[in-house]
Design a protein with these regions (language model features):
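Feature for long, exposed domains in two main contexts
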Residues: 1-285
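Short acidic low-complexity segments
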Residues: 130, 142, 534-543, 766-773
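Short alpha-helix capping/helix-loop boundary micro-motifs
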Residues: 136-138, 307-317, 536, 765-767
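Short, charged beta-turn/beta-strand-edge "cap" motif at the junction between a beta-strand
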Residues: 157-161, 332-337, 557, 786-787
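Pre-ATPase regulatory/linker segments immediately N-terminal to the P-loop/RecA-like helicase/translocase core
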Residues: 164-166, 170-437, 489-490, 502, ...
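ASCE P-loop NTPase motor cores of helicases and related translocases
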Residues: 209, 354-552, 670-732, 738, ...
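Conserved helicase motor core of SF1/SF2 NTP-dependent helicases
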Residues: 469-472, 481, 500, 541, ...
Length: 958
């Protein structure tokens, strides 16, 4: 323990010998201290105010200024290769002379990057004699400081490399020592080009206003406009009920009390009310989140037959506004006590920062430019109603199907040898196909497919075998997103060994999907509206029963029920990426079409990304856990009984050194790398990575976290620049741009990197969040972790580092690379998380680290970041703290806190929930610089038989 002659929480004066900067905990407070090793270690300027802020009254008679004072909480910036200097004053405020024995650079990071001088460093205009007389060194000689006098010296920083430069300067005054720490952030032209000219302003969460505009008075007129054309569909055989939220349960949930249906947890007896209550929680949260769009005294602009409304920051908000959502408008000049009508319209199109609206013609006829309105948005509830309907239908399912652990009869599947259609099946894949073909109903059969193990190949083989060898089979294939469903269709129809007739296969699409969104070669398998061939439609019952294979999203499967297809119509139901869907979403295809003899196959990986949930309460009770994950926790599946589950373990994607860490952390070391040896790539980057035989590189960069405008999403310009440098190097060595992908947790970092690539590279390289890369792969993956500081508050102690602390996101991120994985980040920050810490030292041990100095190697356990949670708890969790009342959704796929302290909360990102391929395809079709960025979260839908968003899948239903 060190002794202090004087101490404050903002500055220190020391009586010990030369020491280095570190940190020690005192009564739960972290304070800067000095230790006896000549190494200042990592100093977090954003976290420890004592580094740069002090009270002169606590300093004693000698007052030393802080070099390179922070500007707006950030270090001063300088371009790499240049030198920046700053004066340091040493003032004697006493009445006695004091001896300044020495001033020394105690330590610098990078080494020797700071120097001292008694002369101001020369400028470009200095004369030659001054330049020759200038001397700089790492220490200054002793001198006497007279009473009331001030000595000015100069501290210079030579910008050696990009990133944070730090120094500790020691002043020995009589018997005391004073330390000052200086920070300089070094950038280059790339990072400087990404500088924001918009200071960050914390966005405020809007609250409901004008209550009577949302709750019409008795007799108050509501004038409804027409719905978007695509939402107008013909009547279905079965009408969907409203499923309005009962007022009693709404009051219980809004009072934060626990509903009776949740007290016992999920049981076989309360299945339906349990999940209906969780959906109500989710819907109430969505209602509340939609209030962020409420606006007063706004104006509409006319655009053709539409009115437009500017919605600033539209792309950054969650839940997002989409076509089909509802808007209620009221002239602002009318007070709340009159009975003026309310105008109810719909969103017809969503653009960058405006929405196109259409109301009843009455409003359009009297509207004039400059008229003022109060408006509120409502989400379309149709998707939620589909989920309620599916849950009600699940009441007829067998208990042994939903809860196989309660079954007294263990299943025994009889298999027969088969002739593979694909000659490349391995032992586990072949076994899974044989089991599926031998199933005769009962509990779901699970194909657990970790990254790169050929899950799609296995499903395709099973479907083709059924189609070819069992003529009476009728198959429903569902995936969580349009792209995933299209991928399965492509695999089926491109298998030349089986001649699939076009009239046997239907690719069912929601009417809201754009025809331009699907590959032209798949259009022959789709159904279109008879009057408008640019609009998808669902065939009528008489046509549906002729198909042997129907492929759709989970949500669109509800169309089949609406057309009257009965339970038991399908002999086999295949649910791909089942771990990404909430349990109610899974019930859409299952509860409507399962009978005792129906074979249900769930394929996916519970150790990767799961469903996206807005309500943290609903998520904590189990809505964030997929049906597949819940089954995997039960007896037969957990024990690996081959009559219930097959685990694929042979990975054909990743190099063995890329695969070894996720295999150890998430799959009990079972995964086996079967990737063919690379002969080209190690030679290609042998001069780029320290160890060409170990293609997992960690590049240590101490950048700075920044935000801009009213956007709470974080970005790190220094890391963005490093990403561009790496890509330029790789392309120079012959790597194709389409073989490179960049993953980063924050939407703003996605945009910054995309902008820099467009400016300095010009190639089409995909940049996106983890969610946008699930199911995809690249030869080279670069991960930018962004965060460069930790805030020591209670929220961070509970929730750690947000994105960095979500194990499933980590797993997906590091398993997208086939041949080379490069992680770029601050090692002193990422080492606080158990999994990222292991990746860091995995690289160090493999002699594949370069960059800034490393932290001390420590084993980081679960306790470091708080109690580890199951995926259902981790996914979309409050990850970086903050208060719920100030949360805002950002497109990076994360809930980001909009508190001034900069902590994130929510799901990605930092992970307050995530971005996901689902919404981009079905809801917004957002595009950045030529590529589609997946977006996050799902919303319910509105009244009528229009198109709607299904929560957790991000799909449109009709």
């Amino acid at each position: 323990m060190l002794n202090y002659s004087e101490q404050s929480n903002k500055g220190f004066r020391f009586t010990s010998l030369y020491y280095s900067m570190g940190s020690v905990n005192f009564d739960d407070e972290t304070r800067s201290v000095i230790s006896d090793v000549g190494d200042i270690g990592n100093v977090d300027f954003a976290n420890d105010a004592s580094c740069y802020n002090y009270d002169p009254s606590n300093e004693g008679p000698i007052v030393v200024s802080v070099p390179f004072p922070l500007v707006d909480g950030k270090p001063q910036f300088v371009v790499v290769g240049e030198t920046i200097f700053n004066s340091v004053t040493i003032e004697n405020t006493s009445t006695d002379a004091v001896t300044l024995w020495s001033v020394e650079i105690y330590d610098s990071k990078p080494k020797d990057s700071f120097t001292l001088s008694v002369m101001e460093p020369p400028s470009p205009g200095s004369d030659e004699e001054y330049i020759k007389s200038f001397v700089e060194s790492f220490s200054l000689e002793d001198r006497t400081l007279l009473p009331g006098k001030t000595l000015t010296i100069w501290l210079s920083c030579k910008a050696m490399v990009k990133g944070l430069h730090t120094t500790a300067v020691h002043f020995t005054v009589d018997d005391d020592k004073i330390e000052r720490v200086g920070f300089v952030m070094v950038e280059d032209k790339i990072s400087r080009s990404l500088t924001s000219n918009k200071p960050y302003n914390r966005p405020m969460r809007n609250k409901p206003f004008i209550p009577k505009i949302f709750s019409p008075n008795a007799g108050q007129k509501v004038i409804r406009g027409s719905r978007p054309a695509k939402a107008n569909s013909r009547p279905r055989k079965y009408r969907l009920l409203e499923y309005k939220i009962p007022m009693a349960i709404r009051e219980v949930i809004e009072s934060k009390a626990t509903p009776d249906s949740l007290v016992e947890g999920l049981t076989e007896k309360n299945y339906v009310p349990f999940f209906k209550t969780l959906l109500i929680m989710e819907e109430i949260k969505l209602e509340d989140d939609m209030r962020t769009y409420d606006m007063q005294n706004i104006t509409f602009k006319t655009k053709g037959r539409f009115l437009t409304l500017e919605v600033l920051g539209l792309a950054e908000r969650r839940p997002s506004l989409v076509t089909g959502d509802i808007i209620i408008a009221k002239p602002a000049s009318h007070n709340d006590h009159n009975m003026s009508p309310l105008y109810k319209g719909h969103i017809f199109r969503v653009e960058a920062e405006e929405v196109l609206l259409q109301f009843h013609e009455e409003l359009h006829s009297f509207h004039s430019e400059g008229d003022r309105y109060d408006v509120q948005f409502e989400y379309n509830r149709l998707g939620m109603r589909r989920l309620y309907q599916a849950l009600e239908a699940s009441g007829k399912l067998d208990t042994e199907f939903l809860f196989p652990e309660f079954s007294s009869n263990e299943r025994l599947i009889e298999t027969r040898p088969l002739v593979p259609i694909s000659c490349n099946l391995n032992e586990e894949q072949l076994s899974a196909v044989e089991m599926i073909l031998g199933c005769k109903g009962g509990p779901p059969y699970i194909v657990h497919g970790p990254p790169g193990t050929g899950k799609s190949v296995t499903l395709t083989e099973a479907i083709l075998q059924l189609y070819k060898t069992k003529r009476n089979t009728v198959i429903l294939v569902c995936a969580p997103s349009n792209s995933a469903a299209d991928h399965l269709l492509g695999r089926l129809v491109m298998e030349n060994a089986v001649n699939i007739r076009k009239e046997d296969v239907l690719r069912l699409n929601a009417t809201a999907r754009s025809v331009d969104d699907i590959k032209s070669e798949f259009l022959d398998f789709c159904s279109f509206d008879q009057e408008d061939t640019t609009v998808f439609s669902c065939p009528i019952f008489e046509q549906l029963i002729r198909y042997r294979i129907i492929i759709s999203t989970y949500a669109s499967a509800a169309l089949l029920c609406a057309e009257g297809l009965p339970s038991g119509h399908f002999t086999h139901i295949f649910l791909d990426e089942a771990a990404q869907a909430s349990e109610p979403e899974t019930m859409i295809p299952v509860s409507h079409f399962y009978r005792r003899n129906t074979v249900v196959v769930l394929a996916g990986d519970p150790m990767q990304l799961g469903p996206v949930i807005f309500s943290k309460d609903a998520e904590s009770y189990g809505l964030g856990k997929s049906f597949m994950e819940r089954l995997c926790e039960s007896k037969f599946y957990k024990d690996g009984d081959q009559n219930y589950v097959t685990k694929l373990v042979r990975n054909y994607r990743c190099h063995q050194h890329i695969l070894s860490l996720p295999s150890e952390l998430f799959y009990k070391g079972d995964l086996v790398s079967c990737k063919e040896d690379d002969t080209l790539y190690p030679l290609t980057w042998k001069d780029f990575i320290p160890n060409p035989e170990f293609p997992v590189l960690f590049m240590g960069v101490q950048g700075v976290d920044e935000r801009e405008g009213n956007n709470p999403s974080w970005f790190n310009r220094i890391e963005a620049s490093e990403v561009v440098d790496v890509i330029l190097n790789l392309i120079d060595k012959g790597i194709k741009s389409e073989d490179i992908g960049v993953i980063t947790p924050y939407r703003q970092q996605v945009l910054k990197i995309s902008k820099a690539l467009e400016t300095f590279v010009g190639s089409d390289i995909k940049v996106g969040t983890v969610e946008s890369f699930q199911g995809q792969e690249r030869e080279v993956i670069i991960v930018s972790t962004v965060r460069s500081t930790i805030k020591h508050n209670e929220t961070d102690k509970r929730h750690c580092l947000g994105f960095l602390s979500n194990p499933r996101r980590f797993n997906v991120a590091i398993t997208r690379a086939r041949s080379l994985l490069i992680a770029i980040g601050n090692p002193h920050i990422i080492c606080k998380d158990e999994h990222w810490n292991k990746l860091l030292w995995h690289c160090v041990d493999g002699e594949s680290y370069k960059g800034c100095f490393l932290p001390e190697k420590e084993e980081v356990g679960e306790g470091e970041c708080g109690e580890q949670r199951s995926y259902g708890e981790w996914n979309n969790k409050w990850e970086e703290g903050g208060e719920e009342s100030s949360g805002a959704w950002v497109p990076s796929g994360d809930w980001e806190n909009v508190n001034d302290n900069g902590n994130d909360w929510g799901v990605e990102e930092e992970t307050g929930s995530k971005q996901n391929e689902k919404e981009v395809e079905s809801r917004e079709q957002t595009s950045y610089d030529g590529w589609k960025e997946n977006e996050m979260k799902n919303k319910g839908e509105g009244e009528g038989e229009g198109s709607a968003w299904v929560p957790s899948s991000g799909e449109w239903a009709m």
